[in-house]
């Protein structure tokens, strides 16, 4: 499954990837590509009340001011996000994960600092308690 950032056309990226694979075959290897479907990327609108409340919850959990918590609209290559937004256009989607700069997320040596897990769990609990 090919995931692309929200600013990229999914089908165009798929075509370019297939062309690249077919044009860069080591030792004349045979390459066959059969696209099975694509998931559309998603870009969040971080101005909604859910993002504001999550920013406040993260700030409280990490012991910083809310303006020190950066909101980002990226990470929306998860196809489910675009499908949910298409089905429920007014719904606010807030994505966050348990990771820190040196955790090696999705890598073979992925390792998350336990204090990060505690902080994220605290932020989630605060968000759920305060979001209406």
Label each residue range with its predicted role.
Residues 19:
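Short edge-strand/loop segments of extracellular domains
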Residues 1, 6-16, 24, 28-132:
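An extended, acidic, His-containing surface patch that forms the Zn2+-binding/catalytic region
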């Amino acid at each position: 499954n090919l995931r692309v950032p929200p600013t990229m056309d999914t089908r165009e990226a798929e075509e370019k990837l297939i062309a690249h694979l077919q044009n860069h075959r080591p030792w004349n290897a045979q390459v066959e590509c059969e696209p099975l479907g694509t998931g559309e990327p998603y870009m969040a609108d971080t101005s909604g009340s859910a993002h504001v409340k999550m920013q406040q919850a993260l700030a409280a959990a990490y012991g910083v001011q809310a303006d020190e918590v950066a909101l980002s609209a990226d990470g929306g290559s998860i196809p489910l996000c675009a499908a949910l937004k298409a089905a429920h256009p007014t719904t606010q989607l807030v994505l966050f994960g348990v990771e820190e700069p040196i955790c090696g997320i999705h890598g073979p040596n992925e390792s998350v600092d336990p204090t990060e897990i505690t902080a994220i769990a605290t932020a989630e609990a605060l968000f759920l308690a305060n979001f209406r």
